[in-house]
């Protein structure tokens, strides 16, 4: 019976470590997808000149948070300031993206391309910091949770 309880505790702690690793991976995925969105939107502004809502509806994202954010922007549901429903991004990052999305279309194409480049540099710096964080802490969280689980089992026995 002690073995089953011990294994359950260790598996539970490992699960927490894997959840932390997954959260860090989702943050990296969000910023990668946002960068891909910016690259494709830059091409759209330069050549296709499709409307923003049409472009967003045709954009397929692997990040659920980016999809939620873009859908809320196009739908403008009952509450524009709704910050719930995002799993890994912070409210400051949501505000940064919203500020960019609301600034789209207020200038001509040349200035719009410059705005996209400025926003892209901000996102690139965030993406680089998130990649460093992921490479530093993802494996560590699983190992640390395993060690913590074993330590709890030892203390319980």
For the regions a language model picked out, list residue spans one by one.
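Membrane-interfacial loop-to-transmembrane-helix junctions in polytopic alpha-helical membrane proteins
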Residues: 1, 24-27, 131-134
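Juxtamembrane/interface alpha-helical elements of multi-pass membrane proteins
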Residues: 5-72
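Generic structural signal for well-ordered, non-membrane alpha-helices
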Residues: 32, 36-39, 95-99, 118-121, ...
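Short hydrophobic/aromatic segments of transmembrane alpha-helices and their interfaces
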Residues: 34-35, 79, 143-145
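Glycine- and small-hydrophobic-enriched helix-loop-helix hairpins
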Residues: 43-44, 49-113, 117
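Membrane-interface, cytosolic juxtamembrane amphipathic helix immediately N-terminal to a transmembrane helix
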Residues: 106-146
């Amino acid at each position: 019976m002690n073995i089953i309880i011990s294994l359950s505790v260790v598996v539970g702690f490992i699960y927490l470590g894997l959840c932390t690793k997954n959260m860090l991976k989702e943050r990296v995925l969000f910023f990668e997808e946002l960068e891909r969105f910016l690259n494709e939107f830059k091409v759209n502004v330069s050549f296709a000149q499709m409307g923003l809502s049409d472009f967003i509806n045709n954009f397929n994202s692997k990040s659920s948070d980016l999809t939620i954010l873009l859908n809320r922007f196009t739908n403008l549901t009952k509450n524009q300031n709704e910050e719930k429903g995002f799993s890994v991004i912070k409210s400051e990052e949501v505000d940064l993206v919203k500020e960019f999305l609301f600034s789209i279309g207020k200038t001509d194409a040349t200035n719009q391309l410059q705005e996209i480049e400025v926003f892209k540099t901000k996102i690139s710096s965030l993406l680089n910091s998130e990649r460093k964080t992921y490479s530093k802490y993802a494996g560590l969280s699983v190992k640390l949770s395993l060690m913590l689980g074993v330590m709890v089992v030892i203390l319980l026995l």
